[in-house]
Amino acid sequence: MATERYNPRDTEPRWQQEWDARKVFETENDDPREKYYVLEMFPYPSGRIHMGHVRNYTMGDVVARYKRARGFNVLHPMGWDAFGMPAENAAMERGVHPAGWTYQNIAAMKAQLKVMGLSLDWSREFATCDPAYYQRQQYLFLDFLEKGLVYRRQSKVNWDPVDNTVLANEQVIDGRGWRSGALVEQRELTQWFFRITDFSQDLLDALDGLEQWPEKVRLMQKNWIGRSEGLALRWALDPATVPGETKELTVYTTRPDTLFGASFLAISADHPLAREAAAKDAAIDAFCEECRRAGTSLAALETAEKKGIDTGIRARHPFDPEWELPVYVANFVLMDYGTGAIFGCPSGDQRDLDFARKYGLSVVPVVMPKDADAATFTIEDEAYGGDGVMINSRFLDGLSTEEAFEAVASKLEQETLDGAPRAERKVNFRLRDWGISRQRYWGCPIPVIHCEDCGVVPVPKADLPVTLPPDVTFDKPGNPLDRHPTWRHVACPQCGKDARRETDTMDTFVDSSWYYARFTAPWEDKPTDPKAANHWLPVDQYIGGIEHAILHLLYSRFFTRAMKATGHVAMDEPFKGLFTQGMVVHETYSRGEGAQREWVTPAEIRIDEIDGRRRAVLIETGEEVAIGSIEKMSKSKKNVVDPDDIIGSYGADTARFFVLSDSPPDRDVIWSEAGVEGAHRFVQRVWRLVGEAAESLRGAKASPAKEGEGLAISQAAHRTLRAVEADYDKLAFNKAVARIYELVNVLAAPLTQVAAGKADQAVTAAVKDATTILIDLIAPMMPHLAEECWREIGGEGLIAERPWPTFDPALVVENEITLPVQINGKKRADLTIARDADQSAIESAVLALDAVKAALNGASPRKIIVVPQRIVNVVV
């Protein structure tokens, strides 16, 4: 009998070698079985995997192993999102080359992932910094350029003064660079852009079809795309107040119904009218410069103090030429949204109200709630931005906001200003084109050449890849490619004259926007093999963090459309199913306070519990340290647990089982040593129970019992099988874990009975069937333990290649049913009764319930309504 403790250090490497030797997880594209593509967001090669990686990749692995067992041809690849600033920072700080640093990290992290026992097809592995990968990315760029999906223009950009590069709007968080944390500046640079806005409406409309995406992510993308319907409205300017030749100002508004509440107009610092005013007024010029130094992102504008300067220009109200409004330059108006000009209605918008209070502008309520009184309705500290009834709005009074919108739009569409309609209905989007130019070395080179005679010339595809020169230095800030003595100098492909290469590289989000397609045929000379891509895509289940809801996921959706437009794929959407997992979090520990606070790692402390109070003390000195909040594991707070330590101490299966067991997969999991030890005890318990009975089970035939002593065992196993199937299908891993715990509790006594030789043939057969089901159920989560148990009971072949078991329908039928019992329509109790009980038996059982007795108080019910198999209602 196998009574020794389970030793993962022995078993896990052995089974990993067996899987590798048999190439169990290598996938053939021409396999006739139904396909299933599961993909976790590939990692940045920082050098170490963390527990968040363990959870993410374990979830994907459970899905891959389960679907493989269900008969699917599963594609489960892995690669590396390998370009980016950290490699350049390492080059500057440590004097190493980004390529060497990156590939060294990849080797270390690959070894860590291998130890986890993941069912990955490593034959498809690539890193985005491989020239073979970015050659095909450059190919896509040239196809997009030819299709008109790429263009180049002067643009105000977010400049990160620490990383010395341009950031997309989405990469500016609260006015700071998403990676460096530096305050972002604005600069004018010539940039390359992808025309993502060509797909704005389609990207928005198609969200409704992504039924297997979290609603939260779809809503975030919808808000980011930001479709709005409104009016482009032309305001006449008082010529006596205009410093130049401009006669009118066009404003985009989504609330033309509030026109009679307008008290000012505001324009962007980059609006032509603002430039005219700045040319004549030093104070306006200085204010415009201040605005330009702020970030360009909406987030930056929303968090900044709202400021403006009166230009002295006056605009005439569209419905009353005698009514003039001041025109301000304001720091919250974006030139690239709408027309770069707005009108402010302080009573209907909080930002406008704050601005009006600050600069002493009038506040006139024009919309009130339907149940409010116009005579008493006022605006104090909060604007009213909801729907309602129009007031103080002349011919609009009494109309609803929707009716007023139509009335204003229709009236102004018919009126003219200088021979053209005063207003035009417009649809606007918040989404901006994607600026991809980055002034750095460690990225995919943009494959164009600049020639004085020919202009911008694409690099011929035959000359791809444009590779990065290895001989660069990082002793100065900025882009080393700009300083390279030879790389940037090249002959023009068209005229042969001296020309220069584009020295900007692509935003690293480009690299991750199509990698899922490359995995379908990474050996292909072109970016994709359309046959393979169209077979495998869309990805059936994509797993990653919700922090990528906008950036990566939206860019990938654009890329799939652009690749379809250029003939590389046939579908619009990259990911059919999306799951956003929670984080792994841990307590924080520290000593000292304020600037003297020093964070302490979990490995350095011991937790003592004295009189119900938890104390953390340093193992080395016994000094007590403070127990802080539970937070996402981070290097800065040192509340990290090294996966190598956990796997080294407990084994990969324990680590995998714990990260799946403790909480729903979309919620954060709190890491605790006690939880890990509990998972490890369960691993040992399963091994002990199966191992002790293994000798008796080896020669037995597996057969579920239909009656007698073994019936309850078989019912428990087959019901658990059916339930866990449903849990795996829904990615409800924690529920599956709970059911497996219950099944082991049921099997404990029978397995002990079999081990002792006290079970008859029928019970032994039922126990072997149930044990086989248990092994199949744990295999996706704890694959090494499952293989070891399977071998121990005499199973043939590998569990990793074994088909999923089928439950016996006769054994999963529940003979009892629980009916909710209502009294006068309100639920008061539950009744558990035989499923085939007739109405008379149900009524008798209901009348015997304490809650019903109390309600009747000795009287008879007026009526008992029984809805078969559903509900009972007692009418008193």
Swiss-Prot record:
Motif window: 'KMSKS' region: 632-636
CDD domains registered for this protein in UniProt: Anticodon_Ia_Leu_BEm, LeuRS_core
TM region positions: none
Single GO cellular component term: cytosol
UniProt-listed InterPro entries: aa-tRNA-synth_I_CS (IPR001412), aa-tRNA-synth_Ia (IPR002300), Leu-tRNA-ligase (IPR002302), Leu_tRNA-synth_edit (IPR025709), M/V/L/I-tRNA-synth_anticd-bd (IPR013155), Methionyl/Leucyl_tRNA_Synth (IPR015413), Rossmann-like_a/b/a_fold (IPR014729), tRNAsynth_Ia_anticodon-bd (IPR009080)
Gene Ontology biological process: leucyl-tRNA aminoacylation
The keyword Nucleotide-binding is assigned to this record: yes
E.C. code: 6.1.1.4
Matches recorded under SUPFAM superfamilies: Anticodon-binding domain of a subclass of class I aminoacyl-tRNA synthetases, Nucleotidylyl transferase, ValRS/IleRS/LeuRS editing domain
Entry's Gene Ontology molecular function annotations: aminoacyl-tRNA deacylase activity; ATP binding; leucine-tRNA ligase activity
Subcellular location: Cytoplasm
Catalytic activity: tRNA(Leu) + L-leucine + ATP = L-leucyl-tRNA(Leu) + AMP + diphosphate
Main EC class the enzyme belongs to: ligase
Ranges spanned by the short sequence motif 'HIGH' region, renumbered to the chain: 43-53
Gene3D superfamilies cross-referenced by the UniProt entry: 2.20.28.290, 3.10.20.590, HUPs, Isoleucyl-tRNA Synthetase, Domain 1
Residues that coordinate or bind ATP: 635
Keywords: Aminoacyl-tRNA synthetase, ATP-binding, Cytoplasm, Ligase, Nucleotide-binding, Protein biosynthesis
Family the entry assigns: Belongs to the class-I aminoacyl-tRNA synthetase family.
Cited HAMAP family: Leu_tRNA_synth_B (MF_00049_B)
Protein name per its UniProtKB record: Leucine--tRNA ligase
Organism: Sinorhizobium fredii (strain NBRC 101917 / NGR234)
Lineage of producing organism: Bacteria, Pseudomonadati, Pseudomonadota, Alphaproteobacteria, Hyphomicrobiales
